[in-house]
Amino acid sequence: MGENEPIHIEYADETELLTEFRQYMADPDTREKAANYLLDSLVDEMILGVVFEVHHAYKTGSGAAIEGQPEDCKPYTIVDLPDMDVFGSSNSKKAIDCSCPNCNRIVAASRFAPHLEKCMGMGRNSSRIASRRIANTRDGGNYFGADEDDEDDADWSGEKRKKKIAPVRTNGSKKNGKTS
């Protein structure tokens, strides 16, 4: 591996390459030069890779994302005050109140939707009452919601019937009373 020899050489076949490799490795001086060349190439590649990575992080601004936010250097203080937890937050829960836009009453937030539904007359029961009221004001020829028609109908909302409990049989008796 002289100074004026080309670095990249094309070989006709594999045997020619192996022959030349064995010639270089037989000479201790050439072996040392090859090892130094290999080491220099690896170190150059490593340094170049790190330089490109740092340059890319700087140009894209991703270096700050990798580093993260610096930690707060001041020590954490423990708060010892009434109605406060150790971090200084208020530990008493305050109920949130809402004002009804219809009647201007103050209502707890958890009860606001049911209150507004009843206050504005838009609940389930209100619509049923309104349907009944409309049906009652119409003439008697209309069968929509008439009370007298409902008297003969079966009551579907009635009580559930209890199932009869079958008597417990002993091992020797059968259903018709005969024993085996």
Curated annotation (Swiss-Prot):
Start-end of Acidic residues biased regions: 146-156
Keyword RNA-binding (UniProt): no
Annotated segments matching region Disordered: 138-180
Signal peptide: none
Coiled coil stretches, renumbered: none
Location within or outside the cell: Nucleus
GO annotations of cellular component type: DUBm complex; SAGA complex
Pfam families: Sgf11
GO molecular function: transcription coactivator activity; zinc ion binding
Zinc finger boundaries on the chain: SGF11-type: 98-119
GO BP of this protein: chromatin organization; regulation of transcription by RNA polymerase II
Source domain of life: Eukaryota
Predominant localisation class: nucleus
InterPro entries: SAGA_su_Sgf11, SGF11
Keyword Transcription regulation in annotation: yes
Keywords, alphabetical: Activator, Chromatin regulator, Metal-binding, Nucleus, Transcription, Transcription regulation, Zinc, Zinc-finger
Reported function: Component of the transcription regulatory histone acetylation (HAT) complex SAGA, a multiprotein complex that activates transcription by remodeling chromatin and mediating histone acetylation and deubiquitination. Within the SAGA complex, participates in a subcomplex that specifically deubiquitinates histone H2B. The SAGA complex is recruited to specific gene promoters by activators, where it is required for transcription.
Domain comment quoted from the record: The long N-terminal helix forms part of the 'assembly lobe' of the SAGA deubiquitination module. The C-terminal SGF11-type zinc-finger domain forms part of the 'catalytic lobe' of the SAGA deubiquitination module.
Family the UniProt entry places it in: Belongs to the SGF11 family.
Assembly and interaction partners: Component of some SAGA transcription coactivator-HAT complexes. Within the SAGA complex, participates in a subcomplex of SAGA called the DUB module (deubiquitination module).
Descriptive protein name: SAGA-associated factor 11 homolog
Gene name for this UniProt entry: Sgf11
